[in-house]
A protein has these predicted regions:
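Extreme N-terminal starter segment of soluble prokaryotic enzymes
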Residues: 2-5
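Metallo-beta-lactamase
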Residues: 26, 107, 117-157
């Protein structure tokens, strides 16, 4: 078992996304994908991973996500926090607070963190055999030396 946790950073948009998986089980998720999804597909293939779920930490008003393209290319489901239920034009997997996502030797836990947007979630990354988290993927909830702002809620109605 080996945890895969790879960050992709697009400096011009200050956008971080992640490939998280377990090399033994071959199961993986992508969190907050960039518009160009080829890097996730290429890396997953080279690492022997199958992307099963695309997680959006929140609705992104500041860039175009690649979630639909990545789901189409892989057959992955698209997951959002529970407050997103009924707000998309496509099917989503509702990721409720406390839910655990098992990837084999790695697991993820969903934390609802409304504030930046009502459906914002953070993802806590665990590795089997280690009780403490390896990482917390915070979307736009936390920034280095700052916190996320309540974001453009008027765009939701």
């Amino acid at each position: 078992m080996a945890l895969v946790l790879k960050q992709y950073y697009l400096a011009c948009l200050s956008h971080a996304s992640y490939l998280v998986g377990d090399s033994a089980s071959g199961r993986a998720v992508v969190v907050d994908p960039q518009r160009d999804v080829s890097q996730y597909l290429d890396d997953a293939k080279s690492l022997g991973l199958s992307i099963e779920l695309v997680i959006e930490s929140h609705f992104h008003a500041d860039f175009l996500s690649g979630h639909l393209e990545l789901a189409a290319a892989t057959g992955a489901r698209i997951g959002y926090g529970a407050a997103a239920k009924g707000l998309t034009d496509f099917d989503i997997e509702v990721l409720e607070d406390g839910r655990r996502i098992d990837l084999g030797g790695a697991s993820l836990q969903v934390l609802e963190t409304p504030g930046h947007t009502p459906e914002s979630i953070c993802i806590v990354v665990y590795e089997r055999g280690r009780p403490e988290p390896r990482a917390v993927l915070t979307g736009d909830t936390l920034f280095i030396g700052d916190v996320g702002r309540p974001d453009l809620l008027s765009s939701f109605g």
